Structure formats: structure tokens, C-alpha cells
Amino acid sequence: MIEETQKYYDSLEGGKVIAIDFDNTVCLDEWPEVGPLFEDAVKVLKELVKNGHKLIPYTQRSKRYPICCPELKQFLKDHPEKQYLTPLGFGQGRVDILTDAINIFKDNGIEVFDINRNLKWEQTTGDDSRKLFADYFIDDHNVGMQYKIIINKNGEKCKACDWNFIDDWFVKEGLYKNKVL
């Protein structure tokens, strides 16, 4: 395990692992739909990848999310192709609300290292703590984060990540090779 850990850190070549939440962090929260992407997020995430850092989207979204609320039932009416049927007796089915979210990274030229999970070698220990390993976490629920107030699809005010603040913070942390404030 120590050798695997060292190989992993060597593969980063000085880069950091950055975990990024999805709804109201990278895009407007229109769960279970994928809301519009924040353009400032695209700029910052591309800059991080360009500087050798690894991005891991982490989110409650899943490929087999239980159909458990009116929003998901409506989502399935609009997108029946997203449903996965489960064996008889195991609930009313599941829905994929992760794939479109991850594709938004790919469609915008943002390379992701992994999705919603720890390093592959950690899984061999049999211990799934569900706590993702990362050097930094970007989430609209972070303590100490500067936010901006936005209006969601229902016309309600909600907070979202301020990517200009995040960009400046990463500059101060020295995560960009050639960028200064």
C-alpha cells in the first residue's frame, strides 16, 4: 500500500487533487436536470488542469439514483431513457442523473481525473469511508467561502460559488505557475 501511495503522489508531479461539487458550484442548481454552467467556473477549472492539478467531481448525483421524490418522477416523464429497472422487490427503479452532469465537464473541455470516488488503490483495502481524498474541496456549502447570490429556476434566491474569489485564492496559494494578482 505504501508503494501504491508513493506511485500516486509521484504521478501528480507536484499537482494537487481538487474535488468539485456540482450543483450551485459548477452550474446552476436545477436538480435533477443539469443547469447552465457558470462560465467563470470553466475558466478556473481549465486553468487548474493546465497547471497540472487533478479534478474529481464529487456530487450526490449517481447513475442509479433511487426514484424517491416528485422531481425525479417528473424527470423520468421528460427523460424515460434515463431509467434503470431494478430486480423485482428492490424498489421502483433507478435513474441516471450523473452522466449528463459529468458530460458537461467533457463538453466544455475540462479534463476530470476521476468521479465521485477515492483513488482506485484505496478500494483494495476493503475500507470505504465515503470521504473523498483531496487537497482542496470546492463546494457551495464550504465554511469561509465567499458567495454570490443568484436566482434559481423557481425565482428564489440562493447562494453559489464565487469563482473570481476562488481563482484569486488559488493564485495566493501558488497553484498557478505563471499567474499573479
Predicted features and spans:
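Alpha-helical substrate-recognition element adjacent to the catalytic core
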Residues: M1-N118
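C-terminal cap/substrate-recognition subdomain and adjoining C-terminal extension
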Residues: C69-L181
